[in-house]
Amino acid sequence: MKTPASLFVRRLNGLAAAALAVALAATACTPPPPEQKPQGKYPWHTNIVATTFWVGEIFNPNAEDGSQVTSTYDSRWMGSYGGCDGRITSEGCQTEARSGSNGYAPSGVKPKENPFYLDLPYDDIHNAAAFRERATVIPWANDEGYKGQDTNSSFSYMKNRWVKIRKDGKECYGQIQDAGPGEYQDKEYVFGTNDARPANKQFNGAGMDVSPALNGCLGFGDLDGESDKVDWQFVDQKDVPPGPWLDVVTTSQVK
């Protein structure tokens, strides 16, 4: 028996509607893809333990790198900065909580350099191996203002470079002013593209120290702890957005 044309069309429409319903149900049950960070020019380094340090801190007077009175890039760091980046107590220069109401500045000194500073474990001045290889591993080594400086021991490719840091939806920016923690030639972590873990095993495996201003800006849970984690990425200066991190910008080179 022949099927009337109208009945055939109705059956086709019914099948199409059923297929659409199945597709919509499958879509509704499929979880959304995880949020992806825009990659940008430089890779992201994720879930990195960040500890806190500050200009003037002396956490181990017996260790070669136990004082922040100096940095690997500035033998007079505390003087260049303007003093203790915190408060002076009977125990010396101590950190303090920071507030956005005054741009996360310290209470006892007016900084002459950027209070939004940090370190990463690559010392391109005093680590001999890092100095030799720096022009071949640092991504911006051939950029204007850097090219041709590879044998100049008074010029650091790392000092003053900008870093974007994120934690729990907050985003802040800072400049590199020292090297560490714990390691000084960790190129796989610092410049690698596969999100390598820091080589450092001290301080809960920290891969970065941040200043008290960055600690406050990012909303760290501890003033001086080892449990806060961040994501970070290098960023060119032209891409740094307005914020308190631009109130005072450090431009000095190696001292």
What is each of the regions a protein language model found here?
Residues 16-27:
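Bacterial N-terminal signal peptides
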Residues 33-255:
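Secreted/periplasmic proteins
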